[in-house]
A protein has these predicted regions:
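N-terminal presequence-like segments and the immediate start of the first folded domain
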Residues: 1-83, 88-140
């Protein structure tokens, strides 16, 4: 995954990331490429596991781009906590497998400093019909 991912434009009245006392918090990032969602729908119901993992990777790359946009120049980033929200039905239980796509994107860019503590949470819907949304907290 490229380290030159542009910061996604906010889809509402918020900023992509906020830095405070050496910690960066991101807004929820969806899998947008050039402002367009990679896919829409619910995982396990039109979105298969492979596509969901790819969408999670794109969302995580977007979150990391948001972190970099407010982190001090030259900061050695360390991903502390990631929350991956997955739009799915009650019967879908491979949440951690979807979130592994997001973790892989972070580790691909930052090495072991990109491997965060993590939660994977199933939800009924996400903004604009996105299948995944990623929030990231990083030390900068």
């Amino acid at each position: 995954m490229s380290t030159d991912t542009p910061v996604p434009s906010p889809q509402g009245d918020y900023v992509p990331a906020v830095a405070h006392d050496g910690v960066v918090y991101t807004a929820g990032m969806t899998p947008r490429v050039d402002g367009v969602l990679l896919c829409t729908g619910r995982v396990g119901d039109g979105i298969d596991l492979e596509l969901a993992r790819r969408a999670a990777a794109v969302a995580a790359a977007n979150a990391l781009a948001a972190v970099r946009s407010v982190a001090p120049d030259g900061a050695e980033l360390r991903c502390l906590k990631m929350t991956v929200f997955i739009a799915c039905g009650a019967e879908f239980t491979a949440l951690s497998s979807v979130a592994d796509g997001a973790t892989g994107a972070l580790v691909g860019q930052l090495g072991e400093r990109g491997r965060p503590a993590r939660s994977a949470i199933g939800v009924s819907s996400l903004p604009s019909g996105a299948p995944v949304e990623v929030e990231l907290v990083c030390a900068a």
